[in-house]
């Protein structure tokens, strides 16, 4: 699952390549839009909204895409070899005189009227990297379902937009609670820190090629992807277990010593509350 900073970087690359330029190539390789031709139109801007990308073109149209797990946008110069995947994985090509943007494996690709963009993104909560960021509303959204596990609430883009699986695990570590802690049991002081901390992490990483949360040289992340290596703070083995149901199930990392709250037992059942 992409993080908000990843999508922000993709939007910036696309904006730098396309905005203000006339499209000389337009090729939508999905049946619904196979006959759509945007050539001759100027790209106005490319804007991220949470994990969604909105490419606006003159004439009041927006190309809406979402990367989800495997999608990507690549930008190529004339004559450069395309390296985003095999040709059958290409979903859309938008080209100008000096750059070509290619969307690979995009699970969501729509064309809508710019005036109706809310149909695609109106359900999203405050965007951590957007102009609509509202920490109080984000926290209110999270608190609206007290029994819900914090990790699942953080991934719900209706609460706040931009957190993916990496930041879910890292935020919970920095707050000192497990991702299975019910939102209603999050101590008030940590709840108050959460929105600001989340925004700080994404803003710090939106211009970096490698995501970092630790500030430690040679160690990029506190827990994500580190199981069963030692915790960077206490030396306890970092653990991993799946959180969520069905298609929403995600590998989730935590330190059983540094993080308080319920966590899966070795057999996978949630219920153990480690001491701090």
From Swiss-Prot:
Pfam families: Fapy_DNA_glyco, H2TH. Its EC number is 3.2.2.-, 4.2.99.18. One of its GO terms (biological process) is base-excision repair. Keywords: DNA damage, DNA repair, DNA-binding, Glycosidase, Hydrolase, Lyase, Metal-binding, Multifunctional enzyme, Zinc, Zinc-finger. It catalyses: 2'-deoxyribonucleotide-(2'-deoxyribose 5'-phosphate)-2'-deoxyribonucleotide-DNA = a 3'-end 2'-deoxyribonucleotide-(2,3-dehydro-2,3-deoxyribose 5'-phosphate)-DNA + a 5'-end 5'-phospho-2'-deoxyribonucleoside-DNA + H(+). Binds 1 zinc ion per subunit. The active site is at 2 (schiff-base intermediate with dna), 3 (proton donor), 51 (proton donor), 250 (proton donor). GO terms for molecular function: class I DNA-(apurinic or apyrimidinic site) endonuclease activity; damaged DNA binding; DNA-(apurinic or apyrimidinic site) endonuclease activity; oxidized pyrimidine nucleobase lesion DNA N-glycosylase activity; zinc ion binding. The keyword Protein biosynthesis does not apply. DNA binds at residue 165. Its cofactor is Zn(2+). A zinc finger (FPG-type) spans 222-260. Gene3D superfamilies: 1.10.8.50, MutM-like, N-terminal. Belongs to the FPG family. Involved in base excision repair of DNA damaged by oxidation or by mutagenic agents. Acts as a DNA glycosylase that recognizes and removes damaged bases. Has AP (apurinic/apyrimidinic) lyase activity and introduces nicks in the DNA strand. Cleaves the DNA backbone by beta-delta elimination to generate a single-strand break at the site of the removed base with both 3'- and 5'-phosphates. This is Probable endonuclease 8 2. The gene is nei.
């Amino acid at each position: 699952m992409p993080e908000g900073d990843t999508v922000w970087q993709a939007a910036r690359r696309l904006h730098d390549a396309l905005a203000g330029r006339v499209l000389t190539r337009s090729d939508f390789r999905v049946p619904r839009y196979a006959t759509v031709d945007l050539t001759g139109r100027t790209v106005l801007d490319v804007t991220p909204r949470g994990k969604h990308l909105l490419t606006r073109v003159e004439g009041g149209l927006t190309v809406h895409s979402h990367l989800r797990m495997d999608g990507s946008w690549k930008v190529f110069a004339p004559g450069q070899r395309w390296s985003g995947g095999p040709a059958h994985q290409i979903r859309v090509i938008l080209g100008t005189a000096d750059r070509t943007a290619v969307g690979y494996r995009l699970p969501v690709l729509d064309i809508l009227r710019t005036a109706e963009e809310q149909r695609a993104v109106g359900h999203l909560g405050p965007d951590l990297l957007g102009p609509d960021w509202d920490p109080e509303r984000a926290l209110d959204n999270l608190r609206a379902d007290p029994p819900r596990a914090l990790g699942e609430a953080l991934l719900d883009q209706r609460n706040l937009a931009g957190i993916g699986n990496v930041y879910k695990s890292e935020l919970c570590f920095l707050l000192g609670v497990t991702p299975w802690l019910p939102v209603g049991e999050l101590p008030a002081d940590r709840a108050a820190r959460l929105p600001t901390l989340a925004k700080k992490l994404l803003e710090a990483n939106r211009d970096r090629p490698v995501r970092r949360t630790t500030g430690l040289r040679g160690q990029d992340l506190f827990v994500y992807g580190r199981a069963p290596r030692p915790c960077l703070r206490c030396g306890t083995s970092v653990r991993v277990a799946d959180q969520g149901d069905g298609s929403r199930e995600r590998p989730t990392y935590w330190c059983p010593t540094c993080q308080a709250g319920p966590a899966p037992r070795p057999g996978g059942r949630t219920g153990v509350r480690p001491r701090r």
